């Protein structure tokens, strides 16, 4: 498996070099809205630890990501009046991974509404700001 690349986009977000629509941060994780969402409220949860994917993250760091993902999922159910949640994680290119920093996709779902194709459109910043505010309010 290739080594972790500290110049990946999510590492740059963690260092403040790239902006994001942050909804949650703690000592071990960061959660922010996907700028190319597959549904309303599509959130990414990442570890602050350098981890390429699920194959190389420590069990302790993965536990932090799992806890934060659950917290986001519960808040997203409320914030977006969802009827379910899809959580996805892709590892390595053959597994569908595009950004090589571990990330969990947390997507609020509604009956009969299909997910958009991956990376099919970039969401408007004002929409992302409004959705971030809803999720932040539900996290309180």
Descriptions of predicted regions:
Residues 1-140:
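HIT superfamily nucleotide-processing domains
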């Amino acid at each position: 498996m290739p080594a972790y690349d500290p110049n990946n986009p999510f590492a740059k977000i963690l260092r403040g070099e790239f902006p994001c629509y942050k909804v949650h941060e703690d000592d071990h994780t960061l959660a922010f809205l996907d700028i190319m969402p597959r549904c309303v409220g599509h959130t990414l949860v990442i570890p602050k630890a350098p981890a390429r994917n699920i194959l190389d993250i420590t069990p302790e760091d993965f536990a932090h990501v799992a806890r934060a993902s659950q917290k986001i999922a519960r808040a997203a159910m409320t914030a977006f009046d969802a009827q379910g949640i899809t959580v996805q994680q892709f590892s390595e290119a053959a597994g569908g991974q595009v950004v090589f920093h571990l990330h969990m996709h947390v997507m609020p779902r509604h009956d009969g509404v299909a997910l958009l194709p991956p990376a099919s459109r970039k969401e408007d910043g004002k929409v992302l700001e409004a959705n971030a505010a809803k999720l932040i309010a539900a996290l309180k």
